[in-house]
Amino acid sequence: MKIKLDLESDALYFRISEDTIEESEEISKGLVVDYDASGKVVGIEILNVKEKFKMEDLIGLKIEMPTIANVAA
């Protein structure tokens, strides 16, 4: 997973997979989901992040991911 905070375009993007984006859908105002050819989510974009989040919270963003052992269980 890759996370990109673009202050110039005021967007936060979570790239979950490197699969090709085939379709994008704004599922809620300012929330766009990217899908691959099979309909799986490959990315999530949050627009207008400066309005929705405190910048200090985004700068110190921490991601908790399960270990492979926990996912396989």
Residues covered by each model-derived region:
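Amphipathic, hydrophobic secondary-structure cores in small proteins
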Residues: S17-V49
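Generic low-complexity, intrinsically disordered sequence content enriched
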Residues: A11, I16, Y35, E51, ...
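Intrinsic disorder/low-complexity segments
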Residues: L12, S38, N70-A73
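A generic structural signal for short beta-strands and their flanking turns/coil linkers
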Residues: M1, D10-L12, K29-L31, K40-V42, ...
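Structured beta-strand/loop patches that form or line metal/cofactor-binding pockets in enzymes
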Residues: K2-I3, L7-E26
